Amino acid sequence: MNRSRQVTCVAWVRCGVAKETPDKVELSKEEVKRLIAEAKEKLQEEGGGSDEEETGSPSEDGMQSARTQARPREPLEDGDPEDDRTLDDDELAEYDLDKYDEEGDPDAETLGESLLGLTVYGSNDQDPYVTLKDTEQYEREDFLIKPSDNLIVCGRAEQDQCNLEVHVYNQEEDSFYVHHDILLSAYPLSVEWLNFDPSPDDSTGNYIAVGNMTPVIEVWDLDIVDSLEPVFTLGSKLSKKKKKKGKKSSSAEGHTDAVLDLSWNKLIRNVLASASADNTVILWDMSLGKPAASLAVHTDKVQTLQFHPFEAQTLISGSYDKSVALYDCRSPDESHRMWRFSGQIERVTWNHFSPCHFLASTDDGFVYNLDARSDKPIFTLNAHNDEISGLDLSSQIKGCLVTASADKYVKIWDILGDRPSLVHSRDMKMGVLFCSSCCPDLPFIYAFGGQKEGLRVWDISTVSSVNEAFGRRERLVLGSARNSSISGPFGSRSSDTPMES
């Protein structure tokens, strides 16, 4: 599979969160030496190649061509054909060319007068006749992040490297561009935005957690440009000796295999949940940088998970073992329940409009709508012909569900009530679709990543059938996460409504 334009995971950042002028990293010589030494040490541990690189040399043909071009022209000898270019005296007289050198410059007298009206400006900004901005000015404006800008962070797998791309999206100005990127050490599989700052002053930040093909979770600061290492990491790589033993169980240090999905607890901000190919879910205490709990309910790779939007203790996860698990994280071993399905679980998501309900998608193309208090699904939807890798409810429009699949299609559904209906279907021309996400501030704006064509943003409200189905539907905006709660599958401490119309 060609990896030249693959986007494997995507996440949005709300308007007004990012720093207006991001900081730029300036490394000292000592820091550069330290980073180089650490990189060499990692390469040696992983059995990297030699440090020697082949250097190219100019070819003989190229050198010969350069010599030919640099050789001076030889003077013409008598009798050469080019001597015919010399004009005789009669021709000079006919055109008065023999007196050409005697004539004065007609513009010489008026040159000084013409300069009298010339105005010189210190810069193009001061010149009223220069209306086009220079490139540097455009770059300065693009570097600033406005309060109305959303950020979109996606993991990209290039042919020879992997990185995070940070895009700026502004619907009002119709702008969408790459702001900066971050070089990654491993293939990215999941991204999750969070604002928890591990510093003691309990401030908020603008961070992105990245799960990859290694057991280590990297957390990067999105307000810093040109950073070469994450702010902090969770977990550690296994040594070669431990790998040879073939142990699959999770240790106190963290996962032992790739991290497939991440979910941040918005109510208890120092908690991050991770799903891994080692069959476990780990709850991380980011203030300590260590696992707080390890959940080993599944018997195969855990591919997806999500915290409840209003209940800090409630978590769901989906696995290759064709099951979904619901946990009460206060006592996960004792308080959990399971649902079994026909296929491997690809995605799970809570319905933030109906907090007792959640959705699950499978690798055989089905979507299930479930009540956490019941064993039977509310409805089963045969949505696609292949695995469903994107499962996203609109951030503000009740009943609007968007699914993305390996069958290359994105489909928009109205799931209000017990009978879902297809509103629109589109081949995105992106090959296999890997991920999707709805903008938290704009309910009809979705981002998609796939096998090719990079990151794509689609305003689904431009489709007439979408406008007919959802255009007049009431928008419900989520209230503050700190003040909002609602009765859910494990009860709640508050009766405040989580929605504001």
From Swiss-Prot:
Gene3D superfamilies: YVTN repeat-like/Quinoprotein amine dehydrogenase. The keyword Phosphoprotein applies. Disulfide bonds: none annotated. The keyword Translocase does not apply. The modification Phosphothreonine is found at T21, T55, T86. GO terms for cellular component: chromosome; Golgi apparatus; nucleolus; nucleus. Keywords: Chromosome, Nucleus, Phosphoprotein, Repeat, Ribosome biogenesis, Transcription, Transcription regulation, WD repeat. GO terms for biological process: DNA-templated transcription; negative regulation of DNA-templated transcription; positive regulation of stem cell differentiation; positive regulation of transcription of nucleolar large rRNA by RNA polymerase I; rRNA processing. It is found in: Nucleus; Nucleus, Nucleolus; Chromosome. One of its GO terms (molecular function) is histone chaperone activity. SMART domains: WD40. The modification Phosphoserine is found at S50, S57, S59, S485, S494. Residues 38-89 are annotated as: Disordered. WD repeats lie at residues 116-171, 177-222, 247-286, 290-329, 334-372, 376-415, 421-460. PANTHER family: PERIODIC TRYPTOPHAN PROTEIN 1, PERIODIC TRYPTOPHAN PROTEIN 1 HOMOLOG. Chromatin-associated factor that regulates transcription. Regulates Pol I-mediated rRNA biogenesis and, probably, Pol III-mediated transcription. Regulates the epigenetic status of rDNA. This is Periodic tryptophan protein 1 homolog. The gene is PWP1.
